[in-house]
Amino acid sequence: MTQLFYDTDADLSLLNNKTIAIIGYGSQGHAHALNLKDSGMDVIVGLYKGSKSESKAVSDGLQVFSVSEACEKADWIMILLPDEFQKDVYLKEIEPNLKEGKILSFAHGFNIRFGLIKPPSFVDVVMIAPKGPGHTVRWEYQNGQGVPALFAVEQDSSGSARSLAMAYAKGIGGTRAGILETNFKEETETDLFGEQAVLCGGLSELVKSGFETLVEAGYQPELAYFECLHEVKLIVDLMVKGGLSQMRDSISNTAEYGDYVSGKRLINSDTKKEMQKILKDIQDGTFAKNFVEECDKNKPLMTKLREENSKHEIEKVGKGLRSMFSWLK
């Protein structure tokens, strides 16, 4: 069985006397910076001039510099910017400030896996990737818990990159829950596949198609919303807590029987073949190439699809229902 590492496996003192620059102060940047700060680390933040996040970082008690200045001052650089912005920022602001002994780190392997960023051989290159959104990483840390994380070493110039990555994971609270070792290739490919085939692409289309099927058959849109979107969380929470078996133990026999006999009518060998094609596009770089080209053109297709999806009936119905849910306010 795959080994998980915990607090006793990581040495936080390895980060003593190191200045850690968090590049970006969004969801993950905010969580990493404050968790490391609360763990006793010397943390600074690197932001572009005029960033809306600057006032928040300052009010949180952090020193803010330009990205270039932060990277010059830092021993450890953690890039927490959107994937599509990392290459340009790296080339202009980060790479010129890399020196022997510095550590370059990421929370997702996209830019390393697909060769968009090519670090010099004299720095360590590691990844620490919490498996949860930034607000959860922060909230769990503040409550004495942690969010599981992945860690990986792409380049070990110092000979200590693995131990350093584990120390960083401890600093943000990851080892409280357990951290799992991987590599940049595996993390990137599985993360992209999960997003596209299951978590975002697959689930979104499944929910919309279910909603449309009921509405087109004459059922109330509000009931279709409840059955095909709202209750997804109830089922997923059961899965997360105890797997598919516990979920099935918690639902009615009617629902469980329907699960077995109808599920494979939707998700079958043909679906799996399409999943394999999606995975191949990720593995051979097709998806990355298309995404980079889309971003270079200022995201015209993505903008069009975002607008089209925002006008779907499920969004209008959901907005109206959620406004009446006291527990969501």
UniProtKB/Swiss-Prot annotation:
Protein name: Ketol-acid reductoisomerase (NADP(+))
Record family assignment: Belongs to the ketol-acid reductoisomerase family.
Membrane-spanning intervals of the chain: none
Taxonomic classification: Bacteria, Bacillati, Cyanobacteriota, Cyanophyceae, Synechococcales
Annotated SUPFAM superfamilies: 6-phosphogluconate dehydrogenase C-terminal domain-like, NAD(P)-binding Rossmann-fold domains
Binding-site list for NADP(+): 25-28, 51, 53, 83-86, 134
A GO term, aspect molecular function: ketol-acid reductoisomerase activity
Enzyme class, first EC level, given as a word: oxidoreductase
GO process terms (BP): isoleucine biosynthetic process; L-valine biosynthetic process
Sequence positions that bind substrate: 252
Nucleotide-binding keyword on record: no
Keywords: Amino-acid biosynthesis, Branched-chain amino acid biosynthesis, Magnesium, Metal-binding, NADP, Oxidoreductase
Residue ranges annotated for the KARI C-terminal knotted domain, each copy included: 183-328
Entry keyword Amino-acid biosynthesis: yes
One cellular-component annotation, GO: cytosol
Domain named KARI N-terminal Rossmann: residues: 2-182
General function of this protein: Involved in the biosynthesis of branched-chain amino acids (BCAA). Catalyzes an alkyl-migration followed by a ketol-acid reduction of (S)-2-acetolactate (S2AL) to yield (R)-2,3-dihydroxy-isovalerate. In the isomerase reaction, S2AL is rearranged via a Mg-dependent methyl migration to produce 3-hydroxy-3-methyl-2-ketobutyrate (HMKB). In the reductase reaction, this 2-ketoacid undergoes a metal-dependent reduction by NADPH to yield (R)-2,3-dihydroxy-isovalerate.
InterPro entries noted in UniProt: 6-PGluconate_DH-like_C_sf, KARI, KARI_C, KARI_N, KARI_prok, NAD(P)-bd_dom_sf
Pathway: Amino-acid biosynthesis; L-isoleucine biosynthesis; L-isoleucine from 2-oxobutanoate: step 2/4; Amino-acid biosynthesis; L-valine biosynthesis; L-valine from pyruvate: step 2/4
Amino acids binding Mg(2+) 2: 191, 227, 231
Gene transcribed to yield this protein: ilvC
EC number: 1.1.1.86
Catalytic activity: (2R)-2,3-dihydroxy-3-methylbutanoate + NADP(+) = (2S)-2-acetolactate + NADPH + H(+); (2R,3R)-2,3-dihydroxy-3-methylpentanoate + NADP(+) = (S)-2-ethyl-2-hydroxy-3-oxobutanoate + NADPH + H(+)
Biological source species: Prochlorococcus marinus (strain MIT 9215)
List of residues binding Mg(2+) 1: 191, 195
PROSITE patterns: KARI_C, KARI_N
